[in-house]
Amino acid sequence: MAIKPTKSFQNCLEAEVPGYNDCPTVLFSIDPNSGPRSKSKQRTKSKRCVSGRLATEVLDLYGNTKTATTPPPVLRRPSVTAAQQESACEGVLVKDQGDRQLQPILCSKEELVAKINDLCVCGSKLSSKELEFYKKKLDSNITKILQNEHTKTVLSQIFNEKDKNMAVKTIKHWMVTDTTISNWCPAFLKIFENAMPN
């Protein structure tokens, strides 16, 4: 078995090393005085990237004529008024299995505050630290929560629901459809889901 001598690549051109740079040469700056040549040997001998920097304006050798353009500006979402928000959340209002609209039993503001407080003080599967964290979130927002009529209607529906799983589904659907409740409703959901039955 013969041992092949190793070749030194210290004093050679990049083109002499097979597979050294498989990237297309179009990515690197090109001498503007030298146009595209037909013979590949002449092209490989000329140095395409003397400075080693990527070119910002590349001479197109492959026939692509489109230049890069800036993307269109990002459009802002239109602001939603409270009336539009309530109309978007109408799907959350009380519906039974046959999709008939039922008359919700509305609770007063005081009744809802009492029910939320009862929910927080009854037994919970959450640790006391978690429960305190979520309770603080609710307590800090309770006055703002109960100013909105739609919120009072949905909370009344949730508290009057006999099936806890249906109430949890209602809360989750409400969270998806109404963005105005995002600062307190996840905490309410956590407390509601983990509340122990009386």
UniProtKB/Swiss-Prot annotation:
Classify the source by domain of life.
Eukaryota
Q: Which Gene Ontology cellular-component terms appear in the entry?
A: cytoplasm
Q: Does Ribosomal protein count among this protein's keywords?
A: no
Residues bearing PTM Phosphoserine = 79
Indicate the secretion signal residues.
Answer: none
GO biological process: one example: ERAD pathway
Q: Does the keyword Cytoplasm apply?
A: yes
Q: Where in the cell is it found?
A: Cytoplasm
Conditions for induction: In response to the DNA-damaging agent MMS.
Q: Which UniProt keywords apply?
A: Cytoplasm, Phosphoprotein
What is the additional note?
Present with 1270 molecules/cell in log phase SD medium.
Q: What role is this protein assigned?
A: Involved in ER-associated protein degradation (ERAD).
- What name has this protein been given in UniProt? Alpha1-proteinase inhibitor-degradation deficient protein 37
Q: Which organism is it from?
A: Saccharomyces cerevisiae (strain ATCC 204508 / S288c) (Baker's yeast)
Q: What is the lineage of its organism?
A: Eukaryota, Fungi, Dikarya, Ascomycota, Saccharomycotina
| Primary gene name | ADD37
